């Protein structure tokens, strides 16, 4: 399930050529910088509501709203009819499709968001690919750097694959949904249509159309008289 077509509808991005020659989807992450060097043609066609910082190497499509306080450092390509909300921080090497949301106090770097991907509140998205109509609940963090030295590994069929990447956050397949305040640890791969429940710390691979639940034990007792 690690091939680009296993996770993503490549028709839902104008940048599908990023995946040409990729055996595994994560290989596209190391190609984003070079892709932007070749394809980025700076231009602003957006509406700005207030004061925002927009760097020189940025393209923003028609109908996109950039709210007050946003910082788009670039290089970055942002598609049509997106919302870049208050205090969003879009760093280096970012490609955002059409109809996407990068919300309040979100930080994004070295990332591709397919069309209609949504990260609306207090999210960190580093070195990741977010599929068509994928969604991050409020406070979701995608961790991209492990504490122990070495490349990030991915397990497949009981074997560990070396991704060759020191920084690698997550791959979210089309329609994947991550609950509020969950953490996706480095190298997480979430299949199409799968769900991670809120407050989970997830590591590893979740197949498509699955639900990962955090069954925390709770106890309810009678309140004693004061």
Tell me the role of every PLM-derived stretch.
Residues 15-18, 104, 110-116, 120-226:
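Glycine-rich hexapeptide-repeat left-handed beta-helix
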Residues 31-80:
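Long amphipathic N-terminal alpha/beta scaffold segment
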Residues 1-51, 193, 199, 208-226:
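Terminal amphipathic alpha-helical/low-complexity segments used for targeting or macromolecular assembly
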Residues 54-56, 74, 92, 168, ...:
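Short, conserved secondary-structure segments in the cores of folded domains
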């Amino acid at each position: 399930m690690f091939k680009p077509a296993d996770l993503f509808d490549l028709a839902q991005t104008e940048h599908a050529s990023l995946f040409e020659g990729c055996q595994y989807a994560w290989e596209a992450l190391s190609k984003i910088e070079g892709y932007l060097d070749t394809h980025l043609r700076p231009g602003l066609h957006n509406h700005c509501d207030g004061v925002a910082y927009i760097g020189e190497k940025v393209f923003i499509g028609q109908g996109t709203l950039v709210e007050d306080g946003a910082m788009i450092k670039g290089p970055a390509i942002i598609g049509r009819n997106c919302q870049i909300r208050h205090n969003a921080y879009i760093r280096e090497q970012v490609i955002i499709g059409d109809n996407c949301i990068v919300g309040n106090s979100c930080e994004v770097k070295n990332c591709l968001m397919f069309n209609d991907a949504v990260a609306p509140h207090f999210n960190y998205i580093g070195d990741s690919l977010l599929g068509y109509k994928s969604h991050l609940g409020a406070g979701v963090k995608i961790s991209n750097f492990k504490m122990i030295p070495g490349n990030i590994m991915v397990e497949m069929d009981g074997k560990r694959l070396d991704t060759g990447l020191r920084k690698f956050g997550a791959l979210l397949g089309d329609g994947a949904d991550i609950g509020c305040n969950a953490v996706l640890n480095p190298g997480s791969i979430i299949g199409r249509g799968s769900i991670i429940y809120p407050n989970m710390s997830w590591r590893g691979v979740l197949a498509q159309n699955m639900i990962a639940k955090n069954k925390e034990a709770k106890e309810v007792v009678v309140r004693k008289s004061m």
